[in-house]
Swiss-Prot record:
Changing K108M: In DN mutant; Loss of kinase activity; leading to disrupted Ras and Rap protein signaling, altered spine morphology and aberrant memory formation in mice. The gene is Plk2. Disruption phenotype: Embryos display a delay in skeletal development and retarded growth. Embryonic fibroblasts proliferated slowly and displayed a delayed entry into S phase. Mice display loss of dendritic spines and impaired memory formation. Activated by phosphorylation of Thr-236. Once activated, activity is stimulated by binding target proteins. The active site is at D202. It comes from Mus musculus. This is Serine/threonine-protein kinase PLK2. Residues 79-331 form the Protein kinase domain.
Length: 682
């Protein structure tokens, strides 16, 4: 049953049903009703089914107990089955751990006995076929599937904070800022699906999953289908009753507009704690849906009312597009948090919570925006966000990574536009040809260099900085030119620690580029070419006017000429600590004996960020999938670390790659990284 419903005698209104089941519900004997069983808190029990497939009726899952240790017959990989996460019509979803690397998945396990009929197996195959091709930040990631004699196993992204249905069950209603936060992510994922010409057809709270970082992922593709032209659309009725659109009920087919209708139902439910068309029986619910008849409480503000009303327009053509939704006043005129605390899963957030960080940002906002004392208030359903808060939000928002101008080309909704294919210059290529190739490959956006003059377009660096870059480029190029072809990464992996950039902020439109190292040192390379670091003790500042010239002073007693820069350094430190996640799983090690790292040069293209440090550490972060390459020198030996899109790291000796080769995905990134390094002063 779907979650949010007052205790009524409505028969299982949240259950996914096919046309046959819906027909019986509409035309059957309405006297045969069974009361829903409330949970301990007085709310109806939710049947949350992570990635549950389409089903006709509820089935029990009695049968042979699934083994604790499961082996993929094809690869020989061993998995450990954990706790049950949810149940569907054909399947149960379990926590499942890959015993080779301890990666945790959500595994949908479907007994062959449940899909013995051809049309049942066809549904599972169709779901796998659609889902395995999808890759988006706000869509549950499909990883792998296999089968043995007893079951089919589908390995999906594990979302530790369960679903929006669980959150709403605990919270009853959400605040407007939270609804904006979640809806933005739903719209992002749904826009990607529609661009792939895929209809979800079962958007509801139980199919929005939340990961550890409070990021939302659209899941459950059991009812998903390819978008067909209007005249070729199938007329079957499928979905969850409370979220069905008028055109689907009227057997006119399911289009993108039908997903928009369901999104309107979702927004209404988040804000008010119940679906808009809920009634005491299914027949009346369908009558209300066909007439688009529902109540709009006065507690909602005008922008929220207007957006809901537009999405729940009876005529599909009158509903807004996903782009229209994001441009609506509900989003433009209201406060949206950059991130949510995990406490929001069970507690109303206090966006006015007083804290040292909040007070710090208050002062920062006052300094940057003139210290206005405007007391005008912005009212929403649950919060009053003052002008002061809007200024703080503006500061936080302004500190976000500068967005890259989108190019008019087709690409994934969460990706930056792709540059042309990279070309690594081989031996024998002339310097002129080399520069031309790299110029074609890398589309530069912005850069910063230690000791440079911000008013000059030339790259001003001394010979030492040039030699650091040349050494890294020579080593990386030598590896790429001589390593053999391979289709996987080497098995030999190292366990070592080194410093790398875990967080970064590009605020070069005002101040400069900020970053945090894995030992919690925070650095800023200012636009005027000076570099300043706040050490992990948060008490000591290192200042470099140029390479090798270091001044050291206390953060609380900075020389007068450095006070403004120390203030900005602290802004960056607070912002990254409060708002940004670490970019990988490498250990954080603080070793005071190690030489201090400071940034020599950073460079952004339309695809990646490059950072070069004084000791030759070289890091490239790729925007679209959050993968990273780090090259460093330890004990006169070069190491390369690759952090994949799941933030899992592997470290190799470059000599190992030179002998064994590597996967194409890693090689392509190494080539692009080399091109960025060679391009850095062009």
């Amino acid at each position: 049953m779907e979650l949010l419903r007052t205790i009524t005698y409505q028969p299982a209104a949240g259950t996914k049903m096919c046309e046959q089941a819906l027909g019986k519900a509409c035309g059957g004997d309405s006297k045969k009703k069974r009361p829903q069983q409330p949970s301990e808190d007085g709310q109806p029990q939710a049947q949350v089914t992570p990635a549950a497939p389409h089903h006709h009726h509820h089935h029990s899952h009695s049968g042979p107990e699934i083994s604790r240790i499961i082996v993929d017959p094809t690869t020989g990989k061993r998995y450990c089955r954990g706790k049950v996460l949810g149940k569907g019509g054909f399947a149960k979803c379990y926590e499942m751990t890959d015993l080779t690397n301890n990666k945790v998945y959500a595994a949908k396990i479907i007994p062959h006995s449940r899909v013995a009929k051809p049309h049942q197996r066809e549904k599972i195959d169709k779901e796998i076929e659609l889902h395995r091709l999808l890759h988006h930040k706000h869509v549950v990631q499909f990883y792998h599937y296999f089968e043995d004699k007893e079951n089919i196993y589908i390995l999906l992204e594990y979302c530790s904070r369960r679903s929006m249905a669980h959150i709403l069950k605990a919270r009853k209603v959400l605040t407007e800022p939270e609804v904006r936060y979640y809806l933005r992510q739903i719209v992002s994922g749904l826009k990607y699906l529609h661009e792939q010409e895929i209809l979800h057809r079962d958007l509801k709270l139980g199919n929005f999953f939340i990961n550890e970082a409070m990021e939302l992922k659209v899941g459950d593709f059991g009812l998903a289908a390819r978008l067909e032209p209007l005249e070729h659309r199938r007329r079957t009725i499928c979905g969850t009753p409370n979220y069905l659109s008028p055109e689907v009920l009227n057997k006119q087919g399911h289009g993108c507009e039908s997903d928009i209708w369901a999104l309107g139902c979702v927004m209404y439910t988040m804000l008010l704690g119940r679906p808009p068309f809920e009634t005491t029986n299914l027949k009346e619910t369908y009558r209300c849906i066909r007439e688009a008849r529902y109540t709009m409480p006065s507690s909602l503000l005008a922008p929220a009312k207007h957006l809901i009303a537009s999405m729940l327009s009876k005529n599909p053509e009158d509903r807004p597009s996903l782009d229209d939704i994001i441009r609506h006043d509900f989003f433009l005129q209201g406060f949206t948090p950059d991130r949510l605390s995990s406490s929001c899963c069970h507690t109303v957030p206090d966006f006015h919570l007083s804290s040292p960080a909040k007070n710090f940002f208050k002062k920062a906002a006052a300094a940057l925006f003139g210290g206005k004392k405007d007391k005008a208030r912005y009212n929403d359903t649950h919060n009053k966000v003052s002008k002061e808060d809007e200024d703080i939000y503006k500061l936080r928002h302004d500190l976000k990574k500068v967005s890259i101008t989108q190019q008019p080309s087709k690409h994934r909704a969460d990706e930056e536009p792709q540059p042309p294919p990279t070309t690594v210059a081989r031996s024998g290529t002339s310097a002129v040809e080399n520069k031309q190739q790299i110029g074609d490959a890398i589309r530069m956006i912005v850069r910063g260099t230690l000791g440079s003059c911000s008013s000059s377009s030339e790259c001003l660096e001394d010979s030492t900085m040039g030699s650091v870059a040349d050494t890294v480029a020579r080593v990386l190029r030598g590896c790429l030119e001589n390593m053999p072809e391979a289709d996987c990464i080497p098995k030999e992996q190292l366990s070592t620690s080194f410093q790398w950039v875990t967080k970064w902020v590009d605020y070069s439109n005002k101040y400069g580029f900020g970053y945090q190292l894995s030992d919690h040192t925070v650095g800023v390379l200012f636009n005027n070419g000076a570099h300043m670091s706040l050490l992990p003790d948060k008490k000591t500042v290192h200042y470099y006017a140029e390479l090798g010239q270091c001044s050291v002073f206390p953060a609380t007693d900075a020389p007068e000429q450095f006070i403004s820069q120390v203030t900005v350094l602290k802004y960056f430190s607070h912002y990254m600590e409060e708002n940004l996640m670490d970019g990988g799983d490498l250990p954080s090690v603080t070793d005071i004996r190690r030489p201090r790292l400071y940034l020599l040069q950073w460079l952004k293209s339309d695809k990646a960020l490059m950072m070069l440090f004084n000791d030759g550490t070289f890091q490239v972060n790729f925007y679209h999938d959050h993968t990273k390459i780090i090259i460093c020198n330890q004990s006169e030996e070069y190491l390369l670390t690759y952090i994949n899109e799941d933030r899992i790291s592997t470290t190799f000796r470059l000599t190992t790659l030179l002998m064994s080769g590597c996967s194409l995905e890693l090689k392509n990134r190494m080539e692009y990284a080399l091109n960025m390094l060679l391009q850095r002063c062009n």
